[in-house]
Amino acid sequence: NITDATNSNEAYRIEIDENGVRLTGASENAVLYGLRTIQNLMVSNNGLVYGTIVDYPRMAERRLHVDCARKYISKDWFIRQIREMSYMKINTLQMHFSENLGFRIECETDPSIVSDQYLTKEEVREIIKEANKYGIKVIPSLDSPGHVDQILKAHPEYGQISNTGEHYKSGLDITNPEAVEYIRSLYLEYMELFLSLIHISEP
């Protein structure tokens, strides 16, 4: 145990003395965060001073939410951002890729809903691979049953129905079994791609 103050698997201890630097971490991620702290100390202090540091997060999850639905964001941008996240010890990236104004990841279930600019599945796999290198979890965010204008452009028949029998353009009709099965098929496709949690509501 790094410290009795926490059971966090991101806790680490740094001991600096005349014999050098000793870093002990509760996990691989903890060791990485310890190295980041050493890097920061060397830059800010122009070297290291003797002493002991015991560090651990107050919040187990530190998430960056990126809206890549309303505006296309490239794979290269995500790769750079993941490296920056590591320096800031942010351990979760939420990719909000579907919205009223866009659907930005390749969709094999229904290509008609995808925006003109989008990330391919191979690009997403590269993003996830890079995130894994830095101990960062990637969570997809697929808006539903609201904020689905982009989907309903292709499938207006799945929209909510008003008292006058007209379809709304912004909300999925969850009383329609076909609409429910359709959105479920999208969930399954992206759960298979990301192999992680999936966020299925408005942010």
Region locations from a protein language model:
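Aromatic- and acidic-residue-enriched carbohydrate-binding clefts of CAZyme catalytic domains
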Residues: 98-134, 147-181
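Generic structural signal for well-ordered alpha-helices
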Residues: 82, 124-128, 184-191
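Residue-level detector of conserved catalytic or cofactor/ligand-binding positions
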Residues: 195-203
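Contiguous, structured surface segment used for ligand recognition
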Residues: 1-59
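Active-site mouth loops of central-metabolism enzymes
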Residues: 63-77, 171-178
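Aromatic/hydrophobic pocket-lining residues that form π-stacking "cages" and hydrophobic walls in ligand
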Residues: 81, 127, 138, 200
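Catalytic domains of carbohydrate-active enzymes, especially glycoside hydrolases
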Residues: 77-99
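Hydrophobic faces of well-ordered beta-strands that scaffold small-molecule active sites
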Residues: 62-66, 93-95, 138-140, 201
